[in-house]
């Protein structure tokens, strides 16, 4: 997909993605240079894994921002915060709103538990929601009355904090439904291992340019780190919260 027209920039989220129209006529949130190479890799890898895992993730793609579009200078922040070349694009859902404590109650438990386990697997601590607020990085699509999963830029976190995860994750209240049931845990282990069968295909799909911040300067994540995080699901201590 090629990006054709800039429509604005989001003021929400740490990366403040740009809003663009693609050559398919659809509108996307787009993350590029400003988000960081690590972020792009995490988004792309996690999005594909989420699809294979069965999560209701918003449609996504790798998009190309032409040099000529940046050169037009329609926004002063495009060159620094987006840049030309390959970027990560997530389709805008026109009838979606950020998940709240109220709409959280509408999410089916099986879907919520899937999200919880997936975030545990990917060490994604960035999905907070308590009665006092938070940033769940989840949307409620009012047109279809369903959940939409977005934002995995902080996945594969080397500083993942188990205590914080279990206290503030949007679906943490369902943890014991998994942790306390051996059959459920075994089913999820089987599911995760099946997803891992496509891991080399996922790796091959990552643009080579994303592995480098600059000439000779690697991105702040390695494939070995991603693979090690995901391979935890094979270990007996995968569910250990101590």
Protein language model annotation of sequence segments:
Residues 97-107, 130-131:
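Short, motif-level signal for alpha-helix interfacial/capping segments enriched in acidic residues
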Residues 109-112:
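Conserved catalytic core of the tyrosine transesterase superfamily
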Residues 141, 145-242:
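C-terminal catalytic region of ATP-dependent kinase domains
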Residues 1-101, 115-125, 143-145, 155:
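Conserved ATP-binding subdomain of kinase catalytic cores across diverse folds
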Residues 69-70, 77, 138, 158, ...:
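Solvent-exposed, non-transmembrane amphipathic alpha-helical segments
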Residues 124, 129-140:
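Catalytic-loop signature of eukaryotic-like protein kinases
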Residues 38, 133, 158:
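Active-site-proximal flexible loops/turns
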């Amino acid at each position: 997909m090629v990006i054709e027209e800039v429509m604005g920039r989001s003021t929400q989220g740490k990366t403040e993605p740009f809003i663009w129209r693609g050559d398919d006529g659809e509108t996307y949130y787009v993350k590029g240079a400003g988000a960081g190479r690590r972020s792009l890799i995490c988004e792309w890898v996690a999005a594909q894994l989420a699809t294979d895992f069965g999560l209701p993730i918003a449609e996504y793609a790798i998009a190309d921002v032409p040099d000529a579009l940046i050169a037009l200078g329609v926004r002063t922040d495009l060159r620094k915060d987006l840049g030309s070349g390959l970027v990560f694009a997530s389709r805008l859902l026109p009838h979606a709103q950020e998940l709240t404590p109220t709409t959280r109650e509408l999410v089916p438990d099986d879907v919520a538990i899937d999200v919880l386990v997936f975030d545990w697997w990917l060490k994604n601590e960035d999905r907070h929601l308590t009665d006092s607020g938070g940033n769940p990085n989840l949307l409620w699509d009012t047109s279809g009355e369903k959940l939409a999963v977005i934002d995995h830029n902080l996945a594969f976190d080397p500083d993942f904090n188990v205590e914080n995860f279990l206290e503030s994750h949007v679906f943490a209240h369902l943890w014991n439904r998994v942790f306390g049931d051996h059959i459920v845990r075994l089913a999820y282990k089987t599911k995760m291992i099946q997803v891992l069968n496509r891991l080399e295909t996922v790796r091959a799909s990552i643009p080579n340019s994303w592995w480098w911040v600059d000439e000779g300067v690697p991105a702040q994540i390695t494939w070995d780190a991603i693979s090690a995080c995901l391979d935890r699901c094979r270990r007996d201590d995968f569910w250990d919260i101590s």
